[in-house]
A protein has these predicted regions:
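Compositionally biased, disordered extreme N-termini, encompassing classical targeting presequences
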Residues: 1-2, 68
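Short, well-ordered alpha-helical segments
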Residues: 2-36
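A cross-kingdom feature marking charged/low-complexity
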Residues: 39, 44-68
Length: 68
């Protein structure tokens, strides 16, 4: 049986939602091995002067838990 752990991470970018998701994944990869999937749960934007100034992506990161 494989046990999978799920964490939530928020990534942000000034250039787009794809980059915000990639930033969240990169942040998780700094401390987690074996990430198997990413689920994008929510994308939000900050608007300044009539345009989008920042994108944020809330993602779920899935990875297996190794047996002890």
């Amino acid at each position: 049986m494989i046990v999978t752990k799920v964490i939530e991470v928020i990534g942000s970018s000034e250039t787009g939602s794809d980059d915000a998701v990639r930033e969240a994944l990169a942040a998780a990869q700094r401390s987690i091995r074996g990430i198997t999937s990413v689920e994008v749960c929510q994308v939000t934007c900050t608007v300044e002067d009539g345009g989008i100034s920042r994108w944020e992506a809330l993602v779920k990161i899935y990875f297996p838990v190794e047996p002890r």
